[in-house]
């Protein structure tokens, strides 16, 4: 990832990366586990709102540093330690919206990193303070390249709102990689009305983004990473067949390292839910010690064991996708193409731009 401009592009072993999830939203142990698991699988992990922790940097072979509108935890020295920089413009679960970290997660360490009072709700802005449009973004990217001496790739993360035009603008601004996040992406930092009603489904975003890259003669030169609801090898194979270069996972990685572990069933019951259905990650009461800053709960998560679980999950996802590629007669995942796909509904056919099963008809295609 990042072969167009960066002197040191990310060379990953698998086409699955770990998306940005902040220290603060997650415990330090969880961030360490993500770093360990991703590194053992030969892929990257991403910081999130709130900055870089020593545990995460120390255990991550490839670490992507997110630059967000809030600038919470932003440290130029940490930025130089990163293997790539991701400028976050939008998130699939809340395009056009900011975020919130509830006060019960703002302990002494989080407060110090974010320069905030302890125990007070933290609100994140939705707009960057030092640029307002694509022309400014181009200048910002050049600034970041100078800071890092043009060594590391610059990612631009956009939400699935206007994928064709947003992808085109990111490419013209000088992005090495476009990360496109569909509305199925998870978050614990916005209201339900956003989660349910704002943005486009991940499937509907891929083709317009690929079309934009092709129209600019930049497909494969500027890489496309798809996120938002990716769960298994089938999702990976479909995204790559539609033209993506890689995918990114967030909520699935949390489950892999031990969230919703049946071991804590009784405690999930006390919270009014059950293992396998718990998603109140914003409240800071996660019995598994992942989405919490409660010292008693955090101690329950062993980063070494949790990292191994994530590694196993990533390897199995990759093997599943490879198996599907072989079934299509391909010797590489990256040889998958739209011709290997068909859709089971008219809606899916129209969104993905592939024929309806049993026909040659692509709805909406002239």
Give the ranges of each region predicted by the language model.
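Glycine-rich phosphate/ribose-binding loops and adjacent secondary-structure elements
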Residues: 125-294
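Active-site or pore-adjacent capping/gating segments
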Residues: 259-265, 272-333, 337
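A short, mixed-charge helix-start or loop-turn motif at secondary-structure junctions
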Residues: 20, 122-126, 191-195, 299-303
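Electropositive, surface-exposed helix/loop patches at the edges of structured domains
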Residues: 78-95, 213-226, 231, 290-308
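N-terminal capping/small domains of soluble enzymes
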Residues: 1-110, 114-123, 136, 304-308, ...
